[in-house]
Amino acid sequence: FTRSPLRSAIGRSAEAMTVITILTAGLYPIIHIGRSWLFFFVLPYPSQRQLWPNFRSPLTWDVFAISSYVLVSALFLFMGMLPDLALLARQVKGWRRGFYRALSLGFGSTSSEWKLFETAYPIFAAIVIPLAISVHSVVSWDFAMTLMPGWHSAIFAPYFVAGAIFSGIAGLIVAMNLIRKVYHLEDYLRPVHFNNLGILLLVMTLLWFYFTFTEYITVYYGGEPIHMTIFWSKFT
């Protein structure tokens, strides 16, 4: 999105991690149902049980949020792989050449195609960013929309967004280091990439700490008995 020259080295790892983690997150609404093997009971289809899903449930929001996020993220990952798939189609032989050529959607690496690709890619990234923010906000509302003391708070949405970016950067650093060691990509994944990710991780750490401090100081200053009981229980 910002056309950073460092994006090409870390972008693919970040995009792949996004898709994998979203697919993993998609399992949790099914797990939270309780009897996961009967998940189809909540689907809106006519049956003799006369049971219908509660569309006001926050878990319903998760279904739509996670589904849209995984679809757009997978398309974003696939779009970034088009030049790589076209390159593979030229390097392999036999049925693999036709397979990769079909996956690359006929990307021929011409100047006009590259110009179109470099124009469309940042636009797609600009679409993914607000979608990611909205998805993590929806997940936070699973907790914030309840009347549970300590959870019913307006700060949960930005708190979850900051935590998602914070943990995502940390996971990306670990994954990139493993890829660098296993596949001997020291010349490609250089110390400057890890240094910049470390700076970004520090910034998000401070932001996450700020949200945590704000949450605790607000509860402490309010002094409501039910909130203070939960507050002190976290320190004992």
PLM feature segments, named:
Residues P29, F39, T212-E215:
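Charged/polar positions within long, soluble alpha-helices
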Residues F1-W37:
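Membrane helical hairpin/interfacial module
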